[in-house]
Amino acid sequence: MHGVGWAALALGVLVSAGVGLVAFGAQRWAGSTLALLAQLEATRTPPDLARYDVSELEGLPAPVQRYFRAVLKDGQRIIAAATVKHTGTFNLSLTSEQWKPFTSQQRVVTHAPGFVWNGHVALAPGIALHVHDAYIAGVGILEPSVLGLYSLTDVQGGGEIALGELMRYLIEASWYPTALLPSQGVHWQAVDDRTANATLVDRSLSVTMRVSFGDDGLIRSACFEARGAMIGKVIVHMPWEGRWSDYQEREGMRVPMTGEVAWLTPQGRKPYYRGTVSDLVYEFGP
């Protein structure tokens, strides 16, 4: 969920394409996606615990306890993996309104934390921007490609890109809420009665987000102080915020069905992702 300044470049690469080229690109992209998914599954290990025990809430900040009591029932099975499908709109520019419809499918594993997001943004009739956004074994990956054939950039590795992708994993964890439990590696620190900090460490990386809770105890927003935005070929650090709503029950847990993600720029808040969960399938620990 990066998407800054790709639209003009993508449309300049290809204004129209034949059906055969589109099909070839889709097939090639599907193969690349399968390879990433195989890498992700190879990192997967089973959760240490099979079920959530409410006793692990003892000592947590008050708003965090209220959250888990609101979304989980004692004995809830621990999520090991999830497949999430989304629909929505994506703004491809940080400086103007270039909202385009998208669909995506995301695979998430919680031990060790990782995901592969496979997105398809409709730039124009017959022209799709395919995007891989991933975090696998401490490596971050961002690859947008017109038709799955013409790569606009291919950034992967540790350091800045990996840190940003681990942030994404954590900010989206309310979709798979057992991943936010202390027993699953998240450390919570009190801020006030409506706010707490959540820290996740994976390998040499550590990320901390500020979480705000509503009157109902549910997570309403989360923010990182600085995340790298890819603007052209330059990384610019800005606060990064996600807002979540429309909580519904899935497999006994309450999870948000809609979300909006924004950069908090010096010029103001700039949303660039507005999405709805269209399908959500969990796999649980033994």
Report the location of each language-model feature:
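N-terminal mature ectodomain segment of secretory-pathway/periplasmic proteins
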Residues: Q65-Y150
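Gly/Pro-enriched, hydrophobic low-complexity segments
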Residues: N197-F284
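Short solvent-exposed loop/turn micro-motifs enriched in small/polar/acidic residues
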Residues: W99-P101, G126, L181, V191-D193, ...
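Short, hydrophobic/aromatic-rich segments at coil-to-beta transitions
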Residues: I79-K85, T110-N118, I141, A190-T199, ...
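N-terminal type II signal-anchor transmembrane helix
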Residues: H2-L34
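N-terminal leader/targeting segments and the immediate start of mature chains
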Residues: S32-T83
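Flexible, processing/modification-adjacent segments and terminal tails
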Residues: E143-D202, I235
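Short amphipathic beta-strand and strand-loop transition segments with alternating hydrophobic
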Residues: R107, G185-A190, S245-D246
